[in-house]
């Protein structure tokens, strides 16, 4: 499985990778830490899943979701965030995110990834 991970914080990036590995998910991860790197990655390869921080210093998660929908509309997108309010969570799901996971509750990431991939496969088969 090829994942594009948009995360500017190295420690969080490593924690997300470790969590995915501990969940038994075998994946190749491409990292992006800025809008430019994310955009270039979207243009250079096809991904099975995109995971993005909701809040980045110079780029919003919603903008990243929008960009991914334009270039890879069928790729599931999951937000991770330290804090995400109810309004932001609803906005992200309405905008096309498959799910969101709080960084303090990363034990739910594996389940969110599996569900997002399963739902994307079901949509593709229709």
Where are these regions (language model features)?
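Short acidic active-site motifs
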Residues: 37
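N-terminal membrane insertion elements
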Residues: 2, 8-25, 32, 40-125
């Amino acid at each position: 499985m090829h994942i594009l991970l948009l995360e500017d914080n190295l420690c969080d990036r490593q924690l997300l990778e470790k969590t995915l590995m501990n969940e038994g998910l075998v994946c190749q991860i491409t990292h992006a830490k800025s809008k430019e790197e994310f955009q270039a990655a979207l243009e250079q390869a096809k991904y099975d899943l995109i995971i993005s921080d909701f809040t980045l210093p110079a780029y919003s998660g919603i903008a990243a979701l929008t960009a991914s929908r334009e270039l890879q509309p069928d790729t599931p997108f999951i937000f991770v965030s330290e804090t995400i309010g109810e309004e932001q969570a609803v906005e992200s799901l309405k905008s096309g995110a498959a799910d969101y996971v709080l960084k303090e509750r990363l034990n739910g990431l594996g389940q969110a990834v599996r569900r997002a991939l399963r739902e994307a496969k079901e949509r593709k088969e229709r």
